[in-house]
Regions:
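A short, N-terminal "cap"/entry segment at the start of jelly-roll beta-barrel domains
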Residues: 1-39, 53, 122-135
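Short, charged/polar surface micro-motifs in flexible loops or helix N-caps
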Residues: 35-37, 47-51, 70-72, 79, ...
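Conserved hydrophobic/aromatic beta-strand scaffold that supports enzyme active sites
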Residues: 41-45, 63, 81, 89-91, ...
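Residue-level recognition of conserved beta-strand positions in structured domain cores
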Residues: 43, 56, 67, 75-77, ...
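A short beta-strand-loop-beta hairpin characteristic of the jelly-roll/cupin
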Residues: 60-86
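Ligand-binding loop in jelly-roll beta-barrel domains
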Residues: 86, 94-120
Length: 135
């Protein structure tokens, strides 16, 4: 079959470590259920006021698409703050320091897609408290 469909009920949610002092996040891998070979895809759930771990991925570029809630992402060094509402997206190029956050009072649900399909070579860097909005 030249396509695969992954329904919401097919997702297997797993807890993932968050930044220090924040509640764990959840991810649902889509790469294998969708039989992707050249890229990686995941759904993410961030509880209110949760931060992912700040990191640099030297090889993978990623696209983040918020489906529910506002996705806040800190990019570059020094970091700049970008807020993305549902209907928008942010593309992060390889080698860019980044940290995804949910600074809202409701759960953030977003889709993340990256290529190439490499995993495990990100470098984690120091967390930051806040950053100015991007100009």
């Amino acid at each position: 079959m030249p396509f695969d469909v992954v329904q919401a009920d097919d997702l297997q949610w797993e807890k993932r470590e968050a930044a220090d002092g924040t509640e764990p996040r959840q991810q649902a891998p889509i790469t294998e259920p969708a039989k992707l070979t050249q890229s990686r895809a995941r759904m993410w759930r961030y509880p209110p006021h949760t931060r992912g771990r700040r990191h640099i991925d030297p090889d993978q570029e990623e696209v983040f698409v918020p489906l529910r809630g506002t996705l806040t992402i800190l990019l570059e060094d020094p970091p700049q703050r970008i807020d993305v509402a549902p209907g928008g997206l942010v593309a992060v190029h390889s080698g860019t320091p980044m940290q995804v956050r949910n600074e809202g009072d409701e759960e953030l649900l977003f889709f993340a897609y990256g290529a190439p399909a490499v995993h495990g070579n990100a470098t984690f860097v120091d967390d930051v408290v806040d950053a100015p909005p991007a100009s």
